[in-house]
């Protein structure tokens, strides 16, 4: 794993916690906007195997891996910040890139794709910039 790729695989206990906090069910339509190797998708599938899931991943090799290993998940190859969704989601669960405030930008972008009453759960830094930009949500 190279640092510039910003791929950091979320450990299973963290993924399980994210999914628990999101309170997902089989009726949800869930987005994982930085899918990586699918660690969060695996936790989603373990909890709500019938939930509709979409995933976005920028790395084409990982997109192939996700498509081969997560049947039923619609995996899109692209930059989440430029990706044009045609729908809104009841749940968004994510571990976004962190460098240069990307976590803030990714989380704010994800909020724009959330249905009214939906839930977004994200890993992010707890610095002053994050508190200033994200606390209002």
Name these PLM-found stretches.
Residues 1-137:
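Class I S-adenosyl-L-methionine-dependent methyltransferase catalytic core
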């Amino acid at each position: 794993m190279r640092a510039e790729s910003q791929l950091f695989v979320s450990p299973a206990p963290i993924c399980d916690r994210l999914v628990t906090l999101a309170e997902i069910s089989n009726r949800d339509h869930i987005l994982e906007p930085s899918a990586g190797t699918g660690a969060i998708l695996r936790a989603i599938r373990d909890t709500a195997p019938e939930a509709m899931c979409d995933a976005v991943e920028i790395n084409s090799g990982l997109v192939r891996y996700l498509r081969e290993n997560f049947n039923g998940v619609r995996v899109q190859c692209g930059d989440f910040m430029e990706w044009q969704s045609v729908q809104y989601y009841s749940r968004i669960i994510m571990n976004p890139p962190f460098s240069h405030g990307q976590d803030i930008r990714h989380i704010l972008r994800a909020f724009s794709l959330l249905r009214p009453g939906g839930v977004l759960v994200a890993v992010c830094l707890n610095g002053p910039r994050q508190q200033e930009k994200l606390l209002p949500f």
